[in-house]
Every structure is written in structure tokens, then in C-alpha cells.
Amino acid sequence: MTTTLITGANRGIGYETARRLVEAGQRVWIGARDAENGRKAADRLGADFVQLDVTDDASVDAAAETLRARAGHLDILINNAGILGEVAAPDNMTAGQLRHIYETNVFGLVRVTHAFLPLLRAAAVPSVINVTSGLGSFTLVQDPERVESQYPLAAYGSSKSAVTMLTVQYAKAIPDVRFNAVDPGQTATEFTGRIGHGVEEGAEAAVRIATLGPDTPTGTVTDRSGVLPW
């Protein structure tokens, strides 16, 4: 059975991704900072729960030890946890605001990936799926026909540009693990103020990559329609 960990999966796109992968027969671990809500989400889905705050070294290390003891390996890691943070125009943006967003969206991804890499390498076909965004695409944010061009989210967007580049660099440096990035698109969750398509569509790209098995590629950046322009 495929063992999968999804960070930030107690609600929204992460929760829907977990639901679909449980339905597909995977053993899914829901990683969440909020233990109460995380356990409730896991119980509803028939998944496992591990408390995991991606901004805290000790929390991430403890979560990795829990999976090592109870699962022995990790087939798929989905770095889904992310925050929008305080929205500020570039001319009013401070280093502190940027650092706060990067701590979860970028440093958290690196922290979790580093901690779980030994468990991934213990799997037959290990895979890491990083949730990025079209708001981090140079092409899309400059295309007036795209919704991404309408949101001046410099801090969040640049954090997702970093996620995309990290994915590509991981893929180049670690050929024994598949690394791919997926863009859910504008999805109607608490994160977006309920604007956009449904979570079913938002989870589609991650679910597709997570169910490819031995055919999983590496170094790709996609949304549910195909290759995401960089």
C-alpha cells in the first residue's frame, strides 16, 4: 500500500487531495499544526494523523520519527501547507512580512523535505509533490487574459516562484526521488475567500501525479490542464 503524507491537509485542497487518495487505496497521513482539527479530519477520512508544524524544526523532526516508527518508509510527500500572509503592495512590503510568508511556503517546504528524505529513500518509487501557484509564474502574471495578472501579491507570488525553482533543483540533484510541482489554480477555499473553482478541480493535478506510480515523471510543473508556463 502506498504511504502518503500531506502537510496542511485538515481542510481545503489538502483535505480533498487526502480524501481522493484514501479513496484510491493509499494510506494517507494528514499532517496539521492544529491537533484537534487534524485528528477530526483524519477520522472523517479514515486516514492517519500526525501533528506537524512546518515552521518548527522539532515538530517536523517528531513527525518524521512518528512515520519512521509506524510506517517505516514514505512513498509520497505532498508539501501542501501554505499561507497567503498579509497582503501589501510592493512599495509598502516589509522584510518581516516577506519572511513570515516564506517561513511557511518556502523554508517549511525545505524543512519537511529534508526531514523526510531518508524515509522517502526507503520507498521503491519515492515522490515529492510541491504545491505551487500560477501567481509565481512570470508568464501568467504578465498576461492580461489570465486571472493571475489581476492580483499584486508580491510576497506570496514570489514565494511560489521559489517553490517552483526548488522543485526543479531538487529534481536535478536527487534523481532517485521524483520531484514535481502542481498548481491547483484559483480554488474556492477559505484561503481565497471562496472565489474560484471547486476543491475537486483544485486537487486534480496533485491527485494525478500521486497516482502515477512507476510512471511518475520528475521536474515537471503542471496544473490540471497540463504544463504550467514558467
Go through each PLM region and give its residues.
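Conserved glycine-rich Rossmann-like NAD(P)H-binding loop of the short-chain dehydrogenase/reductase
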Residues: 24-40
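The beta1-alpha1 cofactor-binding region of Rossmann-like NAD(H)/NADP(H)-dependent oxidoreductases
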Residues: 50-62, 95
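A glycine-rich helix->loop->beta "capping" turn
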Residues: 66-79, 85-86
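Canonical Rossmann dinucleotide-binding motif of NAD(H)/NADP(H)-dependent dehydrogenases/reductases
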Residues: 1-29
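Hydrophobic positions on the long internal alpha-helix
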Residues: 78, 112-116, 120, 166-167
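Catalytic loop of short-chain dehydrogenase/reductase
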Residues: 83, 87-102, 121-172
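C-terminal helical subdomain
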Residues: 161-165, 172, 176-177, 181-184, ...
